[in-house]
């Protein structure tokens, strides 16, 4: 499956300054651009369009991605990350694990008394007990480390996450 459009934000400036963007397939872009030159396509206000600070941060971030080969680095770490994530299979309460690149989603079994409670407890324990920042949605733990992560840090992240998952079982 290939998306027609992709929206993105934080990663374009490393989260330093608010900025986002949209990538569209050529045929979609061309459809928007068919109007007269004086007609603004996708008009929605543009309060912060081309903000100089955000654009400077975005360009600097893109330079770092390129100069430090961060995309290649992340691609090389994919197997290590996936293996570490999949090692959590079989832990109590883990229903499913999905990875793509350096992103993982871990579905936890809901507690009978309250949906989302197990993942919420995991988020609290991860932060307070392990110093690990995770995101949750319902009973799903989502995690994506920075692109500068090392293999050793990936191991540390998933060791901490395993302790958290066992603690909330």
Predicted segments with their positions:
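Conserved N-terminal phosphate-binding loop of PLP-dependent enzymes in the Aspartate aminotransferase
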Residues: 1-169
């Amino acid at each position: 499956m290939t998306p027609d459009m992709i929206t993105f934000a934080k990663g374009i400036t490393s989260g330093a300054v608010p900025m986002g963007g949209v990538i569209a397939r050529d045929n979609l872009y061309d459809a928007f651009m068919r109007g007269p030159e004086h007609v603004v396509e996708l008009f929605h206000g543009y309060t912060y369009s081309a903000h100089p600070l955000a654009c400077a941060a975005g360009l600097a971030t893109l330079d770092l991605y390129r100069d430090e080969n961060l995309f290649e680095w992340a691609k090389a770490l994919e197997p290590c990350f996936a293996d570490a994530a999949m090692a959590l299979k079989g832990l109590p309460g883990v229903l499913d694990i999905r990875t793509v690149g350096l992103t993982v989603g871990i579905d936890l079994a809901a507690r009978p008394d309250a949906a989302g409670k197990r993942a919420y407890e995991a988020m609290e324990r991860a932060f307070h007990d392990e110093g690990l920042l995770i995101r949750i949605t319902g009973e799903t733990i989502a995690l994506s480390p920075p692109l500068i992560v090392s293999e050793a840090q990936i191991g540390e992240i998933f060791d901490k996450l395993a302790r958290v998952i066992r603690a909330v079982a």
